[in-house]
Amino acid sequence: MIKFSIRGENIEVTEAIRDYVESKLTKIEKYFAKDQEIDARVNLKVYRERSSKVEVTIPLDSVTLRAEDVSQDMYGSIDLVVDKIERQIRKNKTKIAKKHREKVPTGQVFTTEFEAEEVDEIPEVQVVRTKNVTLKPMDVEEARLQMELLGHDFFIYTDSEDGATNILYRREDGNLGLIEAK
């Protein structure tokens, strides 16, 4: 059973939108065990230029499913995001099946009644370069400047105040995000 948490930013989540989101996401219930409770977090945003962003996050025990879409049509974005989530489920199930052949732990996340569909073969990603870095103590502003000077989308550094390892990264919207390791 899916529990929905639907939130809107710069938009009122009407009953029609809520019903549409729930009806579309309910179709993925067939992929999960009947007794499994699934939390689906849906975030709907509308921007000044009237484009909308739909984000769906479904945290599971072994994996987090997440998809987003930005377009002028919120209902179209909802459809695309649900399709992306479905593809992720199929890929995940296929990868688990390939990795464990006979002993597929599908009951942990996905229902055993669901047959893994073969998806377009994705080339295996390989680590092609290893780089050792010395983390220097600095504040966020200095890390931002270093990241921009290097032309990177992320920068790892040691926080000069608490000594924690932090990762500063550029988000898709152009802003910056900060991951603080504990």
Curated annotation (Swiss-Prot):
Main location: cytoplasm
Gene Ontology CC: cytosolic small ribosomal subunit
Gene3D superfamilies (UniProt xref): Ribosome hibernation promotion factor-like (3.30.160.100), Sigma 54 modulation/S30EA ribosomal protein, C-terminal domain (3.30.505.50)
SUPFAM superfamilies, A to Z: Ribosome binding protein Y (YfiA homologue)
Pfam families: Ribosom_S30AE_C, Ribosomal_S30AE
Recorded superkingdom: Bacteria
GO molecular function annotations of the record: ribosomal small subunit binding
UniProt-listed GO biological process terms: negative regulation of translational elongation
Keywords associated with the record: Cytoplasm, Translation regulation
Annotated compartments: Cytoplasm
InterPro entries named in the record: HPF/YfiA_ribosome-assoc (IPR050574), HPF_long/plastid (IPR034694), RHF-like (IPR036567), RHF/RaiA (IPR003489), Ribosom_S30AE_C (IPR032528), Ribosom_S30AE_C_sf (IPR038416)
Function as written in the Swiss-Prot or TrEMBL entry: Required for dimerization of active 70S ribosomes into 100S ribosomes in stationary phase; 100S ribosomes are translationally inactive and sometimes present during exponential growth.
Family membership noted in the UniProt record: Belongs to the HPF/YfiA ribosome-associated protein family. Long HPF subfamily.
Cited PANTHER family: 30S RIBOSOMAL PROTEIN
Assembly description: Interacts with 100S ribosomes.
NCBIfam families attached to this UniProt entry: yfiA
Protein name: Ribosome hibernation promotion factor
Gene that produces this protein: hpf
